[in-house]
Amino acid sequence: MCIVFSPREIVSELDRFIIGQNDAKRSVAIALRNRWRRQQLDGPMREEVMPKNILMIGPTGVGKTGIARRLAKLAGAPFVKVEATKFTEVGYVGRDVEQIIRDLVEIAISLVREKKRDEVKVKAHINAEERVLDALVGKTASPATRDSFRKKLREGELDEKEIEIEVADNNSNSASTFDIPGMPGAQMGIMNLSEIFGKMGSRIKVRKTTVKDSFKPLIDDESEKLLDQDQIIQEALRVAENDGIVFIDEIDKIATRDGAVSAAVSREGVQRDLLPLVEGTTIATKYGQIKTDHILFIASGAFHVSKPSDLLPELQGRLPIRVELNPLTREDLRRILTEPEASLIKQYIALMAMEEVRLEITDDAIDALADIAVDLNARIENIGARRLQTVMERVLDEISFTAPDKAGTSFKIDAAYVRQSIGDLAADLDLSRFIL
């Protein structure tokens, strides 16, 4: 399922969305390519080659999460992002780390199901069309009548005609799962009625709708009939095992500093629970067993207070590739505003265009935005590129609010407008702490 790219192509694709951080991009590109290389191997060697997990070190807002998320999207791989601080040691109240893998399996099933739906889309559309014709002319209509109505249907003449359709009521069979204390993963034994009795428990729901609006639910219904659920689950488990990517953020927050006494529930215990996951173990899910040996783990943290060596030595050894991401400079922030395919400025211009308002942002305005963001990051708290969103929202606040009343007009935003909108707030440190 994973799409194959060379490391150079991966870095080039990441460059379209993320500015700078070439070392991190190279590391994840090599890690992704190594997966493909491993899958080409035969025999025992294939099982022996383990992924080289990555530890990204850098302040917030410099692109750590963005790189991992884009990598997974690029590869078409199941991806789950978790925060290390959300988990507690097994035996305490809270989420245990095995839930990470269960979430990954759920995402893999969704990905595989969508892929299989695309494969049967044409057949499902044909079947849906037949059901619409049944609703229009009845199942006993002559072939000539059906052909006549089929022609009108395809030409859109019947789009607004109301019909009644029967579709499966999926909500009635939704699973009710919950954790049993002291039994991690116990929800795997609790299954909904449709899983136990097959389609016996499924209910039919009658809906009144127009011909045009009937196609989507009917195509979904027909797609489900054409899909082999067991095959989807087996393929999803394989995809999660071989292509899955787990991004563990804020891992520095569970690092125990020398001599530090913390009231938090065993940070070291969470690290110890992560060890078998990262090294390779078997996790029980309600869909079956899944091995974590070949899942790629990318951990990240700012390490402002703690340092990577404060992590358990065993966990450090399971994150062999270290990548330091650089704080963003003024030039980086300027490029972030303009260069990515969906840059902030392009987003705001597109949003205002929906109100028929033309937005023009000059080069000196972009310089001013970058200067203010750098200044605020230096004086208050360095939150990286995220500061740009705060500054942009403040600058465009009035235009966004009045846009519906200004259809057909143009706004030119220059450096003077930026400073007028935000200058006093940026200068007042007490105010900017709360507003910017």
From Swiss-Prot:
UniProt-annotated location(s): Cytoplasm
Annotated protein name in UniProt: ATP-dependent protease ATPase subunit HslU
Function: ATPase subunit of a proteasome-like degradation complex; this subunit has chaperone activity. The binding of ATP and its subsequent hydrolysis by HslU are essential for unfolding of protein substrates subsequently hydrolyzed by HslV. HslU recognizes the N-terminal part of its protein substrates and unfolds these before they are guided to HslV for hydrolysis.
HAMAP family in the record: HslU
Assembly information from the UniProt record: A double ring-shaped homohexamer of HslV is capped on each side by a ring-shaped HslU homohexamer. The assembly of the HslU/HslV complex is dependent on binding of ATP.
Key word Metal-binding present: no
Residues reported in the UniProt entry to bind ATP: I19, G61, V62, G63, K64, T65, D249, E314, R386
One GO cellular component term noted in the UniProt record for this chain: HslUV protease complex
Keywords: ATP-binding, Chaperone, Cytoplasm, Nucleotide-binding
CDD domains linked to this entry: RecA-like_HslU
GO molecular function: ATP binding; ATP hydrolysis activity; peptidase activity; proteasome-activating activity
InterPro entries reported for this sequence: AAA+_ATPase (IPR003593), ATP-dep_Clp_protease_ClpX (IPR050052), ATPase_AAA_core (IPR003959), Clp_ATPase_C (IPR019489), HslU (IPR004491), P-loop_NTPase (IPR027417)
Keyword Chaperone: yes
Domain of life according to the entry: Bacteria
One GO-annotated biological process of the protein: protein unfolding
Family in the record: Belongs to the ClpX chaperone family. HslU subfamily.
Main localisation: cytoplasm
Species name: Bartonella quintana (strain Toulouse)
Name of the gene encoding the protein in the UniProt record: hslU
